[in-house]
């Protein structure tokens, strides 16, 4: 019963993201109670839950198919940051908005991608492996890529970003792995509802950031929305093309598209709120990204499911 309820709510995540996005802009008071300081805590809990769903042996899966995993991870960190930087330059985005767009483009694949891959009837095992690999590599690549592409807009403290990611990502994931090893029964129980908990915290983070930055979003909505839509649409398209060029099967092509096109927007929001709190516009592309990539991903999943 619990598993079925958690699974049902989790699979409707794209719908909840859109609803929360609309509600947070229409009635900000519904989400403003969450608070900026809770963003990092929420993401840490999500990563802890992710760690509890993994085994140390799962990491060997990456080495069993290095070419496939390598293709996905290289595409993730090569395509999205460069594409985000190109959009920021070509659209002449304000400096703060440009940094926010590049920051979220430099983040790893998000756990929501695993849900969308499942809905699209693509390769879920590959999706989980890619998310895990890109999340671990992001500890070093996200700060470096953000500094590389956005450093000329604003001063970026790459070391501070690195320390935050270690605290928010690596430590909770490793703690979750240890917990599962030592307290297997309790970890198994928690892992049954961890996808549901992850969805709830992501929705709270998205709702809070959109509500807190409502005036900025409404003031720049056309520019913001255009930039974020192009970012993710390009990611989905180019990710799919990578699979086609390397002659992968349809299931793997769809998985690459979703993994490249969907980012860990929660990590982007956590880093933006921690390191650019004095620059409110930096957080807005990250928050809007969570809604946009879920919407595009779910529409693609629906289309692929009904494609003959």
Report each predicted region and the residues it spans.
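Alpha-helical transmembrane segments of multi-pass small-molecule/ion transporters
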Residues: 1-308
């Amino acid at each position: 019963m619990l598993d079925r309820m958690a699974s049902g709510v989790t699979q409707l995540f794209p719908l909840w993201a859109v609803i929360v996005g609309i509600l947070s802009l229409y009635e900000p008071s519904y989400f403003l109670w969450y608070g900026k300081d809770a963003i990092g805590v929420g993401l840490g809990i999500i990563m802890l839950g992710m760690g509890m769903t993994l085994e140390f042996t799962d990491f060997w899966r990456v080495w069993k198919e290095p070419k496939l995993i390598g293709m996905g991870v290289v595409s993730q960190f090569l395509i999205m940051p460069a594409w985000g930087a190109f959009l920021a330059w070509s659209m002449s985005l304000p400096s703060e908005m440009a940094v926010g767009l590049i920051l979220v483009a430099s983040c790893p694949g998000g756990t929501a991608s695993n849900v969308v891959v499942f809905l699209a009837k693509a390769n879920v095992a590959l999706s989980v492996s890619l998310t895990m690999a890109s999340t671990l590599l992001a500890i070093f690549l996200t700060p470096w890529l953000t500094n590389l592409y956005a450093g000329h807009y604003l001063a970026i403290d790459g070391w501070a970003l690195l320390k935050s990611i270690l605290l928010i990502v690596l430590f909770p994931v490793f703690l979750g792995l240890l917990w599962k090893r030592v307290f297997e029964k309790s970890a198994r129980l928690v892992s049954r509802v961890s996808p549901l908990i992850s969805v709830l915290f992501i929705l709270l983070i998205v709702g809070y950031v959109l509500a807190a930055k409502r005036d900025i979003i409404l003031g720049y909505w056309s520019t913001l929305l255009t930039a974020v839509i192009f970012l993710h649409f390009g990611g989905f398209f180019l990710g799919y093309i990578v699979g086609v060029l390397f002659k992968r099967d349809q299931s793997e092509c769809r998985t690459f598209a979703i993994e490249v096109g969907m980012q860990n927007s929660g990590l982007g929001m956590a880093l933006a709120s921690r390191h650019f709190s004095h620059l409110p516009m930096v957080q807005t592309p990250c928050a809007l990204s969570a809604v946009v990539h879920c919407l595009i991903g779910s529409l693609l999943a629906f289309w692929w499911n009904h494609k003959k």
